[in-house]
Amino acid sequence: MSELATIIGGPVSPYVRKVMAVCDIKGVAYRIDPIIPFQGNDEFGRLSPLRRIPVLIDDEVTLADSTVIAEYLDERHGTPGLFPKTPAARAQARWIEEFADTRIGDVFIWRLFNAAVIVPSVWKLARDDDAIARVVREELPAVMDYLETIAPPDGFVFGALAVADVAVAVHFANLRWASTGADLAAWPKTCAWVARTEAVPVLARLNQLAERSLTTRRTERPALYAEFGIPLAAASLAGKEFRKGPLSV
């Protein structure tokens, strides 16, 4: 690929971190426009009709879904492969990623991180701790119960690190940043699996970047991303107003 790819979306999003991780593991160089989805201008809405991040732009295609992007990058850029080899295992990997993107994302991101962090900081509404506690009590256990049935006793689900492992693990940092008080000790296999995945240097680095970006002012972004060796896009698709997408909760 002759030019740097562009990733639109900030690393606080687990879906953006998933794509950044795939790029880093495969050695795909990229620049980033670290906007939040509610911040995108009209051009962003054209590229991402659902007004969601990430968006990937490279010399061949523009894509606006993290699952599609991850599979495209894996197919285009070869080794190391991040999907298992057999049809059955690949189907299982896609299912795990789908569960992560939808069910884990719904509970961890929309119902917890969004309610605890985005609603107060972006929409300037009060954090509803009673509603958050109810989700932790009534919805989170079912997610964790299922993950406990698929968590490997050691290593990763398919032996080598795969997108499926990354897709699950990226949500757990956002759960911690939401400060919900959720106690995950009842699911030791899942916690150990996530910890192993988060300890992979690429993931550890991206979590560090994301956590720091939570408290980094816009004027300080260039220095932060320069520190992590990630160039910023020359022009940003950030708009002046915050607006929700058609599927926003």
Task: For each feature predicted by the language model, list its residue ranges.
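Acidic/polar loop patches that form or flank catalytic/metal-binding clefts of enzymes
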Residues: L82, A204-L206
